[in-house]
Swiss-Prot record:
HAMAP family named in the record: CH10 (MF_00580)
GO molecular-function terms, A-Z: ATP binding; metal ion binding; protein folding chaperone; protein-folding chaperone binding; unfolded protein binding
Protein name as it appears in the record: Co-chaperonin GroES
Pfam families: Cpn10
Family to which the UniProt record says this protein belongs: Belongs to the GroES chaperonin family.
Gene Ontology biological-process entries: chaperone cofactor-dependent protein refolding
């Protein structure tokens, strides 16, 4: 899958299903995940003058993104999130 423009495809890292004390959390009580791993990167955004700005993330980077960002898609039996580079808040090094 190759994203277009400044879009990034990520695989979401799921949150823990148990609390530290061992209580199992139902899906309705879980926080929406905000961490993922970059699996594909678009070519970057194009400025008004035609210059292309390359994305700051690379395939394999672990990232933190905005809570309600992106579009969920299913591809080859796996679930991914496609979001814009501006929705990425940080890269975890």
């Amino acid at each position: 899958m190759k994203p277009l423009g400044d879009r990034i495809v990520i695989e979401v890292v799921e949150t823990e299903e148990k609390t530290a004390s061992g209580i199992v959390l139902p899906d309705t009580a879980k926080e929406k995940p905000q961490e993922g791993r970059v699996v594909a990167v678009g070519a970057g955004r194009v400025l008004d003058n035609g210059q292309r700005i390359a994305p700051e993330v690379e395939v394999g980077d672990r990232i933190i993104f905005s809570k309600y960002a992106g579009t969920e898609v299913k591809y080859d039996g796996k679930e991914y999130l496609i979001l814009r580079e501006s929705d990425i808040l940080a890269v975890i090094r």
